[in-house]
Amino acid sequence: MTTVSIIGKGTMGQAIAKVVTAGGNTAELVGREDAGKPLAGDVVVLAVPYPAVADVLAAHREHLAGKIVVDITNPLNFETFDSLTVPADSSAAAEIAAQLPQSRVLKAFNTTFGATLAQGTVGEGGPTTTVLIAGDDADAKATLAGVIEAGGLRAIDAGSLRRARELE
């Protein structure tokens, strides 16, 4: 059994928690009021908007070393909706990985809506929801894929962390 700490109690955080628990794993939902507290999970999901990531990392950095950290953000420029707010040769996940050298950073869940995750299918009776996973650590990807698949969804290895930009 895997324990997954999900930082963010919004729509995505709750949907991911539903997937985690559907597979018999444990989900810990973490909010602002929990800043600085130890995280129970070996897997930590950053289910917050990209502009909030810096504050989340500052509040939890010491508890992220050695953990699998899953970035679900899309660093979209919400003023123009036509570009990302990270450098052209980078991604939100790469920026997070640079700040967390002791963690195994993955990109996942950012191409799927919360409702689709919670429902488990694309539309009523449609195909099983698919979650793309990008990252450089095969064991970390296998751990996350196991949690996703146990929850009834499909997990696909999307390649290295360099692929995160395409997913964003």
Residue ranges and their predicted role:
Residues 73-122:
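Rossmann-fold NAD(P)-binding glycine/threonine-rich loop
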Residues 37-38, 62, 98, 121-126:
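Solvent-exposed alpha-helices and their adjacent loops that cap or buttress functional pockets
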Residues 1-35:
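NAD(P)+-binding Rossmann beta1-loop-alpha1 motif at the extreme N-terminus of oxidoreductases
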Residues 28, 35-68, 72-80:
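Rossmann-like NAD(P)-binding element
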Residues 3, 26, 42, 130, ...:
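Residues at the starts of beta-strands that form the adenosine-phosphate
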